[in-house]
């Protein structure tokens, strides 16, 4: 009875409208790069995508919302509401999840798929501890690879064995050379690299030796050839400063004046000294005994004066050898070589 009352042409039109609306609904969603802990979608990737198109990449964190909303609503969601509501994750299981190299998908305690670090350690022959480029000792190379996967993508093994305070017994791989930095830590560095010419004035660096280096690469190379740390005084070309007032340090650093050579250098002064009774007292270059090296640094930052360790223990306990003091002239506690050699 109903079909007899509707014109055949009207049925064709209704069928066309139905399929158009169905297709439009399938295309009207928004694709997001992640689902936050609050359950909302965050980091908008693309609008007007179907769930199938949004989720075909295989990324674990990709999510989708079906609401077809205007730009104003999207803006409010992202800025004021912590993301878009009704967030649908693309992946509910680990099936076809691509976590990338060194990772694999596992279901967590909440029965949700998560990418976890799982480096391939099957080809590692050295099973003992290794020293990383960050100056930390890892129990083995596999532990270092996991740390690299989690938070340090540039982390590499610099030499086998625990990190050392001297180049003695350090076997550097390939053509790299062992140098000791200003905090008395041994690092393996490459001296034969070719440094490109600077393309910007911002690349110039002033070394603790009062010499201007064209770039961090040039400072690395000079450090390597010297065999011990030069250290960074401040960014930019070296100037004939009369005091720290003439030196502009980057954010978070403070100028300390070295009265011995009449130069200033920028240092990090935000270190808090732990309350530990195990620290060894040090005799500083101002002939004052400090309870620890950290306490000496704290005093230096407070006074705006560069202080260096002359020797361990009380200043009254050892008659300093002038030759040894000369050897430590360029020591600097503010800029570990890891930050200089890996720029």
Swiss-Prot record:
The keyword Cytoplasm is assigned to this record: no
Disulfide linkage: 31-54, 41-87, 55-90, 94-105, 99-115, 117-149, 121-142, 131-163, 191-224, 195-217, 206-238, 269-301, 273-294, 283-315
CDD domains the record matches: KAZAL_FS (cd00104)
Domain TB stretches: 29-102
Top-level taxon in the UniProt lineage: Eukaryota
UniProt cross-references to InterPro entries, sorted A to Z: Fol_N, Follistatin/Osteonectin_EGF, Kazal_dom, Kazal_dom_sf, Prot_Inhib_GrowthFact_Antg, TB_dom, TB_dom_sf
GO biological process: negative regulation of activin receptor signaling pathway; negative regulation of amacrine cell differentiation; negative regulation of embryonic camera-type eye development; negative regulation of embryonic pattern specification; negative regulation of horizontal cell localization; negative regulation of neuron projection development; negative regulation of retina development in camera-type eye; positive regulation of retinal cell programmed cell death
Subcellular location(s) of the protein: Secreted
A single cellular component GO annotation: extracellular space
Domain named Kazal-like: residues: 99-165, 185-240, 263-317
Tissues expressed in: Ciliary ganglion neurons. Levels are higher in the iris than the choroid.
Residue intervals of the Follistatin-like domain: 93-116, 166-189, 243-267
Disordered: annotated span: 315-343
One annotated GO molecular function: extracellular matrix binding
Broad class of where this protein is predominantly found: secreted
Keywords recorded for this protein, A-Z: Disulfide bond, Glycoprotein, Repeat, Secreted, Signal
Signal peptide segment: 1-28
Biased composition (Acidic residues): 320-332
SMART domains in alphabetical order: FOLN, KAZAL
Residues listed as glycosylation sites in the UniProt record: 123, 287
Oligomer and partners: Monomer.
UniProt function note: Binds directly to activin and functions as an activin antagonist. Inhibits activin A signaling in the iris and regulates somatostatin phenotype in ciliary ganglion neurons. Specific inhibitor of the biosynthesis and secretion of pituitary follicle stimulating hormone (FSH).
Protein's UniProt name: Follistatin
